[in-house]
Amino acid sequence: MRTLLVFLLLTILVAVLIGNNQVEACTNNADCHGLGHCYRGTCFPVMG
């Protein structure tokens, strides 16, 4: 039961993050608040 609850919470979190990403399209790297790079209106996290 706990595993199902964790899975549902993670699914909701991912859906919210995807929704926010589509609503707030970036125009440059400053729109990503230093957490990533803007590419075609979407902020991608910086790895490494």
Swiss-Prot record:
Expressing tissues: Expressed in salivary glands. Highly expressed in the head, body and tail with a 2-3-fold higher expression in the head.
Q: Which domain of life is it from?
A: Eukaryota
Q: Which cysteines are joined by disulfide bonds?
A: 26-38, 32-43
- What's the family? Belongs to the annelide toxin family.
Methionine amide: residues carrying this PTM: 47
Enumerate the subcellular locations listed in this protein's record, separating them with semicolons. Answer: Secreted
Species: Haemadipsa sylvestris (Indian leech)
Predominant location:
secreted
Cleaved signal peptide residues: 1-21
The extra comment attached to this record reads: Does not show effect on voltage-gated calcium channels, potassium channels, and tetrodotoxin-sensitive sodium channels. Does not show activity on Nav1.7/SCN9A, and shows very weak activity on cation channel TRPA1.
The UniProt keywords, alphabetically, are:
Amidation, Disulfide bond, Secreted, Signal
Q: Give the coiled coil ranges.
A: none
Q: Where does it sit, as one GO cellular component term?
A: extracellular region
Function of the protein: Leech salivary gland peptide with unknown function.
Has UniProt tagged this entry with the keyword Disulfide bond? yes
Which residues are part of the propeptide segment? Answer: 22-27
Do the record's keywords include Signal?
yes
What is the protein's given name?
Peptide HSTX-V
